Amino acid sequence: MFITVINHLARNSSDSQVYGIRMANDYINAQQREVVHQLGRNWLWRSELPTWALMVGVYGGWFGCVIYWQTLGLFLTTLLLIVFTTWYMSLQHELIHGHPTRFPRLNQLFGTLPLAVWYPYGLYRDSHLAHHRNHTLTEPDEDPETYYLSPERWAQLKPWQQRLIHLRNTFPGRLLLGPLLDIVATLKMMLLARDLAAVAMWVIHLTLLGGLFYWMQQQGLSPLWFVVAVSYPALALTKIRSFYEHRAEEAPLARSVNNEAAWPWRLLFLNLNYHSVHHDLPGLPWYGLRKVYLLYRDGYHQRNHGFRVAGYGEWLLRFWRKPVNVNAHPGTHKDAQHADHFTADVRYPPSDDAWPDRSANDAAETTRRAG
């Protein structure tokens, strides 16, 4: 199944056909397009040195912690591994979007090691690229990363299941309960996998994971400890970033948040807190998201209808006990009425775009992840 990122604003967008798929950037205006092009001509940006340095830091830090854990001590090693494992998941996302190389197979190689344990890189890639169809963003039957349920599915849930969803939709619940629900859904997906490509991904993933656990055991570090004390908390940290990252809105460009988080979170999540910018410019490298956001902060505030938050602490205070209203999807009728505007064309040669989304697309079928 081909994965497409759709162009919503034809006048202010520039397409590029990469790996047989037309991707699109949604610029605020022509001036922003020119500014992004100028930034893209910078040698440092084009060299992708920040991403190469990031890979060295993440891999070096992760394996260094395991090798020298007895010197560091178990407590410090655990804390550092939580950070490096979370960082690795952020790096995998960057690899999916075509960085640091133009070769998807090479990028896949950089992200295939199961340092985060829970899912194969290829399945995450396919699911995430389907998520980037902005015109169906948040829709339960179309967006594999949505937390919304269809009204029919919501009505079928038992009262205790609805209460569980409400609990998950609080900030503490998303961190504590969210990873468990995701893991259960992932295991269910693995057991029900029938597609040969998906089965192959799981076989490779589990084989590599077994080898990684064996090596870890040889270093004297318990794989069980790693799963419980490192991998689960790391997955929980990613739930901080994704908490209320999207909302159901009629306008597709108003469905993604811009979270003005503090620098430690920005670094850990590779600036994906500027999520509206990322969805508008999916090929922009992580080190460009904040710069572009700050240059056009007011424009993005207007574009996404004020969906902006001052940091993750604001979500914590607002949704410590109160659940965010992400359960039954309310529906977005405007998209259905204007679906012709979101038809991707994969036949034509690329235009000159400074930052096309060089996402990999070599899987046979999109694999959905339950949310």
Please place each PLM-identified region on the residue numbering.
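Non-catalytic, topology-defining segments of multipass membrane proteins
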Residues: F2-W87, P114-L224, Y287-G371
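Membrane-interface elements of multi-pass transporters and channels
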Residues: L72, L95-F103, Y121, L187, ...
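Long, highly hydrophobic alpha-helical transmembrane signal-anchor segments
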Residues: T77-L109, A130
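Transmembrane alpha-helical segments that form the membrane-embedded catalytic/substrate-channel core
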Residues: V83-L95, P120, Y124, R174-P179, ...
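Divalent metal-coordination and catalytic microenvironments
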Residues: H93, H128, K158, H246, ...
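Juxtamembrane helix-capping/reentrant segments at transmembrane boundaries
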Residues: P100-Y119, P140-A155, L253-W265
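Functional transmembrane helices that form membrane-embedded active or gating regions
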Residues: S256-H275, L284
